[in-house]
Amino acid sequence: MKYVRRFMWFWASRLLIVTLVVSIVVCAFYMCMNSANIYIVLTDGLEARVRTILTASGAETLGDYFHADFLNQDTALQGAFNGTSVFGAYNITDFDYVLSVEKLWAWPWDDVATCTVTERVPSITGKVLSSRKGEVDEQIPAWQGGRYEITLKRSGGKWKIVGMKQTGIYIEPDPTPEPTPTPKPEENLEAMP
């Protein structure tokens, strides 16, 4: 009986250890999978949002990244389509977009994730629409980026952004032309013919 008990305890303890290791590996796998999916939704979705605000086009793709309720309440997107956006007077041809994900956490068993991101648009290329020349400044206004607390929700196996709260503001500085140095006069004037 003593040997049977030892034999059973040996296999039970090994089974428990293997079960714990497999559980940790499965949990880590799902956390990584959720984090990767969320990261893609954040980077692609927020860039598509900025593109839509700057150019007033491409709104058809926003539903892939944002929940419909969020899109209906986003004042920046509404401004792009009702003509109140400061970028509506410009033909934006290109922009640089920088998104830094500072914090991202998604439990494998949870359908809600939160993250902290910093969004910047360091440069915007374009020019004033011909119909608006003289009405607005030739310099395109700087993008008001910032730090955001973003909430995502998984529904139907897809992560979508459902909330975006700005916790800090970052305004890109206006580009100023680099000063050119004044040439120094020749110290040796005798060398001149």
Where are these regions (language model features)?
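N-terminal Lys/Arg-rich, disordered targeting/topogenic segments
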Residues: 1-11
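Terminal "cap-and-tail" regions of soluble proteins that handle hydrophobic small molecules
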Residues: 9-19, 39, 43-64, 175-193
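Hydrophobic membrane-insertion alpha-helices, especially the h-region
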Residues: 13-32
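Core segments of small alpha/beta cavity-forming domains
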Residues: 28-102, 106-107
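Beta-strand elements of well-folded, non-transmembrane domains
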Residues: 54, 119-125, 152-156
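Surface-exposed, charged secondary-structure patches
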Residues: 84-136, 191
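Low-complexity, intrinsically disordered terminal/linker segments enriched in charged
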Residues: 129-193
